Amino acid sequence: MKKIKLMPDYGCFPIWGMDDDNFGNIDPYSLPISKSLAEELLVWSNKYDKTLNIEEPLNSGFENIEKENIFKYEGEKLFKKLKLELGDQYTVIYPS
């Protein structure tokens, strides 16, 4: 069983391989999931990318706690969808 992590990072896909033979950033379209879920994952990741303050990286983050909580809630929903679509083929981790 493959192990992946759902975790946004600036300028990266939101899926990370956690196995020795599948380690690193993974394009959601390369996974056996629906196109619509892959698109949702990328939209979610783009929301995170928009929080980056290039000039002052230490000041990066969401505008307020409400937007951050909404983002986390969306991540939890995507985590559940990802687990459902991948079934027993993958172990999915989401550090909420």
Predicted regions and their residues:
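Intrinsic low-complexity, intrinsically disordered or marginally ordered coil/linker segments
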Residues: M1-S96
